[in-house]
Amino acid sequence: MKIAIASVQNDKNSEVSDIAGRAPYYLIFNENSELIDSFENPFTEQKGGAGVAVAKMLAEKGVDMVIAGAFGEKMTDALEVEEIEYLEKGGLVAETIKEVLRE
């Protein structure tokens, strides 16, 4: 299982980003809470459709779930099309991934 978390910084000790589509970074973890990938979001400055573009990018990376403080309606629609679960949750990235995997 791959879980992507929208992050304010490129660091697992960062805060979860309040916005999914325009989050500055994404960190991807495996089912053991291990960070397996991190990257800058190339769609933060896109005029429109950032959330849809992020959903497609995460699908291409094989992500099963994405976590952010909030999601726009177009992004949630795109995630549902890609069959990616989504969860609105805040806090520190490192704590959030552990909490989600415990549930």
Language-model features: locations:
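GIY-YIG nuclease signature motif recognition
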Residues: Y26, V66
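Gly/Ser/Thr-rich helix-start
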Residues: R22, G49-V52, A70-E73
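C-terminal structural segments of small proteins and small subunits
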Residues: A70-E103
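Extreme N-terminal starter segment of soluble prokaryotic enzymes
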Residues: M1-I3
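Conserved mixed alpha/beta catalytic, RNA-binding, or beta-rich assembly cores of soluble enzyme
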Residues: A6-Y25, S33, P42
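Compact, charge-rich alpha-helical regulatory domains located at protein termini
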Residues: I36-M65, E82-L87
